[in-house]
């Protein structure tokens, strides 16, 4: 849980910590604390909530998968919502995408926006499946393995596009999507 002081907004230190979370590919929830001091009696004002959430999202755009919970630890406002979100992230970490449906989602995404070509070669997905991470952590990010013709043909931006389509289909709040590409030679390449 990345706790941000609502009175000071996202600081340089907050950005560094968020960057470490993103680099380590860890689950995350952003808690905007001290809401009582910012809201001045307008705690439930939807416009104020939206404005602050959008500002956080803009500054921490690289943690787009992390839900934002606005709360006040002092008054107890939305503290239960934070714990509910922690449980939701944990539950979704066990969600499995069926192989057939995953392949249909990826095929539709590639038909909607074809992968770029390198020279006269085009990236092709032979098939994809969700794998189980061998971590002992109780909350694991979903790991997808794509068996492809050549992992070197796909730019990171296109992997991000495919991860976004997976996220559109299956809700994985607070969880980064991990993608491994395996070429015909079998050596895995972790991309996203």
PLM segments and residue spans:
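C-terminal-of-GTPase-core extension/linker across diverse P-loop GTPases
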Residues: 2-3, 8-192
């Amino acid at each position: 849980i990345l706790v941000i002081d609502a009175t000071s907004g996202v600081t340089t230190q907050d950005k560094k910590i968020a960057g470490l979370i993103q680099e380590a590919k860890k689950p995350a929830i952003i808690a905007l604390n001290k809401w009582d001091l910012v809201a001045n009696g307008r705690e439930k004002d939807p416009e104020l909530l939206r404005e602050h959430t959008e500002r956080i999202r803009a500054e921490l755009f690289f943690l787009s998968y992390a839900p934002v919970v606005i709360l006040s630890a002092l008054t107890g406002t939305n503290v239960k919502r934070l714990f509910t979100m922690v449980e939701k992230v944990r539950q979704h970490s066990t969600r499995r995408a069926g192989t057939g449906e995953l392949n249909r989602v990826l095929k539709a995404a590639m038909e909607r926006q074809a992968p770029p070509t390198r020279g006269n070669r085009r990236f092709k997905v032979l098939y994809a499946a969700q794998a189980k991470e061998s971590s002992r952590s109780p909350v694991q990010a979903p790991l997808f393995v794509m068996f492809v013709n050549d992992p070197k043909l796909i730019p990171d931006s296109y992997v991000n596009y495919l991860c976004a389509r997976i996220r559109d289909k299956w809700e994985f709040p607070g969880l980064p999507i991990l993608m491994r590409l395996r070429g015909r030679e079998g050596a895995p390449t972790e991309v996203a």
